[in-house]
């Protein structure tokens, strides 16, 4: 009954679909505020670059990303899920699956697709040129979790929309996944200190800040590990899991060998990074 009520509320004929971005925005703002406060009260690392240098570019690019997505994909993934359901598109709309199982399956499989996409962004040179802007941040905190090049965001959206149609993902499952992905991306990029026991317990299921920080190391073998954003299982299953950085969390260097100058943190410089030479990057 709860699922049916939600679906009726999202029905495009009564304008209920407009509530979905408001829900996402509310959760985004709440999680962002909580994590910023946590970073100030209990930081994991002492920043080597001031927030005043990094945050304007990081926040500026997410504003651009958001505007572009809303203009080019006005109904977003939840709206497409409703269209797919109405037309019987996708596996979960063809195979008789209980609602809750369909929602759970969609969330897990969408997370696997994000993991696979992330690996491709590192493995394919042209895609890496887009993704490396995310890794060029000289520190890692909650704003790094929303720092993605606009072209990468649009490409990710196309992949996500294709996955929603092929899977026949329920609208509620897509909405939950979108909210979780935004929240966990900010969480696992945040500069927060967790007790060792809590981190170890969370790592049974989720990607923690310490785990994902390894992925932002300047050391190539560490950069090419820990690709998960939400569920830990994929890194363990596919052999890409790395427990800790060799230099330790406090001493490790964040970022890439290229783009070390603080001027590269400006928004205009960030946006043209995919066009820049990678000869000095040293990833191989």
Please place each PLM-identified region on the residue numbering:
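Membrane-helix interface motif
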Residues: 2-7, 74-86
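Short, strongly hydrophobic alpha-helical membrane anchors
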Residues: 1-19
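Alpha-helical transmembrane segments of multi-pass membrane proteins
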Residues: 1-5, 32-43
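Loop-to-helix transition at the N-terminal end of transmembrane alpha-helices
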Residues: 19-27, 50-63
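Membrane-embedded catalytic scaffold of the fatty acid hydroxylase/desaturase
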Residues: 63-76, 88-251
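Interfacial loop-to-helix junctions that mark the boundaries of transmembrane helices
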Residues: 14-23, 93-98
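Membrane-interface helix-loop junction between the first two transmembrane segments
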Residues: 38-55
